[in-house]
């Protein structure tokens, strides 16, 4: 979610406790007395009865339809920089130098392979904080996670991360698959709907992006009517986890449970995404592949084991007393890089050149919409992309117009922020049909707008794709990004550590003004967009393999598309898993179990009694 909806700014951000609605399932306790007896209860007695604290599990929170923000409190406690440190201290690093040609060479015990993935928005936030370029920020993070002066310098086992992956690489895969998905949906637009029994049905138009977990959580809990429109593609974070775990499991002959994947993301809601049951090895596991089996594991293994944010990355460094600014802003030495076990995958994951596609026109959230439009524009020479701003800067309509006919070729839109998302879901809400036979279609209160128009999506039915993000301003404004006050404190501490002076405590006392916050976001955006000319790969571990093809310049769009589809086919063939199981996911309507007993019957009386005791009611 956005910084505006973070825990520090919302007074309805509740930790699991008596305020959570889950106690409705167990409270009030049934009296042991005879139910036929009458009892007079005074108000004083009711007020004195304190409800027991709720025992909320992560599954409860994700299956709850009461709120969105309280789930983050659970996830923050379960996925944090402390979990990273505890895991590194609990398990020694499994050195993969002894693995050759997919044969395990004496790896025993509880050792783990540690892999990290970093989003470009995190690098932009770090770069703006420390006054370095986006490329240097990437090197700083890599040195911290994998270098000799970073995490490996401390801890019980001196464990660090064997590989650090740029999620931009996997994002390119999602961009290409998004274009394919929209093309398939448009082809089905006038035909019969896909069978509901299909595991991954083609979404209805307009397709809504599904990479933002805050938006997905909101849709599943409150607007299930939009679920058929959601893109079935995994997000770059989720797809990176699947990609890493399936390939390393296959090539190194280790179960997914021994591969620990950390994702560093710009928002807290990515923790929600990593905790989804649909994003575990159970979704792609096949019965005839014992190599993927996780012995003695009762629970499915997550594709992403832990998610931390930009701010938590600073906390991770602080916990180990590591000054990030003192780390080398250069690639890792070759002596500290480990060859990836598959040369072809290594060439793809760690390219010598990579076009970041982080321009102003592509936006701050991955460029899904921009890639779709430019791909179709390349198929229609001389066509033009027209943009029209909506009610605010976070709503923009795009139309690709034919040069010959002047007619629209494809229409798309961008909706950022929950205020705009609410307007969007209202447009997609189907019209209420009368239960009376032969009744005429209802007419909207607004003159001239029929129910058929509302059912068609209120003006968005002819859109092919809509990029939806919960954060106003997009992903660079994620709630986990480094705030302007944190950046001031970090800069003060960094300066004092360099010149030896004592840090002052004045900076934290000054609350930033809205103008300062906007200026800070603009600075982060500027760094993010500058990465297009400052593109870099992580320290390539594939150089020592000697099998990679040299690429002197970035691939052209058509060649990039062919390269992506080729690597996807190679991935599926290598693992023996159908490609849809690897790249697609599913969404479901979250139904509240409030007021329902275990046998499914409603228990309205108990709910009403509890509501009265806590001062509420229906």
UniProtKB/Swiss-Prot annotation:
Residues 495-516, 530-560 are annotated as: Disordered. GO terms for molecular function: 4 iron, 4 sulfur cluster binding; iron-sulfur cluster binding; metal ion binding. [4Fe-4S] cluster 2 binds at residues 212, 267, 471, 475. SUPFAM superfamilies: Fe-only hydrogenase. It holds the Pfam family Fe_hyd_lg_C. PANTHER family: NITRATE, FORMATE, IRON DEHYDROGENASE (PTHR11615). Belongs to the NARF family. This is Cytosolic Fe-S cluster assembly factor NAR1. It comes from Coccidioides immitis (strain RS) (Valley fever fungus). The gene is NAR1.
């Amino acid at each position: 979610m956005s910084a505006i909806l973070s825990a520090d700014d919302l007074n309805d951000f509740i930790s699991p406790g008596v305020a959570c609605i889950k106690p409705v399932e167990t409270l009030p306790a049934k009296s042991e007395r005879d139910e036929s007896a009458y009892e007079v209860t005074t108000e004083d007695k009711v007020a004195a009865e304190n409800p027991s604290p709720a025992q909320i599990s992560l599954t409860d929170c994700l299956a709850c339809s009461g709120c969105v923000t309280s789930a983050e409190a659970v996830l923050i406690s379960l996925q944090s920089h402390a979990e990273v440190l505890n895991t590194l201290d609990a398990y020694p690093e499994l050195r993969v130098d002894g693995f050759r040609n997919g044969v395990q060479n004496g790896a025993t015990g509880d050792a783990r392979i540690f892999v990290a993935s970093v989003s470009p928005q995190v690098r932009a936030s770090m770069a703006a904080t420390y006054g370095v370029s986006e490329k240097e920020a990437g090197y700083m993070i890599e040195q911290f996670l994998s270098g000799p002066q970073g995490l490996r310098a401390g801890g019980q086992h001196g464990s660090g991360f064997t590989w650090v992956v740029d999620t931009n690489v996997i994002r390119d895969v999602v961009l290409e698959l998004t274009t394919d998905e929209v093309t398939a949906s448009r082809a089905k637009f006038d035909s019969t709907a896909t069978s509901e029994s299909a595991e991954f049905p083609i979404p209805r138009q307009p397709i809504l992006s599904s990479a933002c977990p805050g938006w997905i959580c909101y849709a599943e809990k409150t607007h299930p009517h939009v679920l058929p429109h959601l893109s079935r593609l995994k997000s770059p974070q989720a797809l990176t986890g699947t990609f890493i775990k399936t390939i390393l499991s296959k090539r190194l002959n280790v179960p997914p449970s021994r591969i620990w994947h950390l994702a560093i993301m710009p928002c807290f809601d990515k923790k929600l995404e990593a905790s989804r049951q649909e994003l575990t090895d159970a979704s792609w596991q096949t019965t005839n592949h014992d190599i993927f089996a996780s012995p003695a594991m009762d629970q499915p293994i997550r594709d992403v084991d832990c998610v931390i944010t930009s701010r938590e990355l600073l906390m991770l460094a602080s916990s180990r007393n590591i000054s990030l600014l003192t780390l080398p802003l250069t690639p890792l030495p070759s002596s500290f890089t480990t060859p990836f076990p598959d040369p072809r995958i290594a060439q793809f994951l760690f390219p010598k050149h990579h076009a970041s596609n982080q321009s102003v026109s592509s936006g701050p959230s991955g460029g899904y919409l921009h890639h779709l439009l430019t791909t179709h524009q390349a198929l229609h020479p001389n066509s033009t992309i027209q943009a029209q701003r909506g009610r605010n800067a976070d709503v923009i309509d795009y139309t690709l117009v034919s040069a010959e006919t002047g007619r629209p070729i494809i229409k798309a839109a961008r909706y950022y922020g929950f205020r705009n998302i609410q307007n969007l879901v209202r447009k997609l809400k189907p019209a209420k049909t009368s239960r009376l036979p032969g009744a005429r279609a209802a007419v909207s209160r607004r003159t001239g707008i029929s129910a058929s128009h509302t059912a068609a999506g209120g003006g968005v039915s002819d859109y092919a794709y809509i990029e939806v993000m919960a954060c106003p301003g997009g992903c660079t404004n994620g709630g986990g990004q480094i705030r302007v006050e944190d950046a001031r404190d970090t800069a003060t501490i960094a300066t004092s550590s360099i010149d030896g002076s004592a840090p002052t405590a004045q900076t934290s006392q000054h609350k930033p003004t809205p103008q300062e916050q906007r200026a800070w976001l603009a600075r982060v955006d500027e760094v993010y967009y500058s990465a297009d000319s400052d593109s870099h790969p992580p320290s390539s571990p594939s150089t020592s393999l000697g099998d990679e093809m040299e690429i002197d310049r970035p691939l052209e769009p058509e060649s990039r598309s062919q390269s992506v589809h080729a690597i996807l086919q190679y991935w599926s063939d290598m693992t023996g898993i159908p490609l849809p199981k690897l790249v697609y996911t599913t969404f479901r309507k979250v139904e509240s179990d409030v007021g329902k007993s275990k046998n499914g019957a409603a228990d309205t009386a108990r709910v009403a009694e509890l509501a009265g005791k806590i001062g509420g009611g229906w």
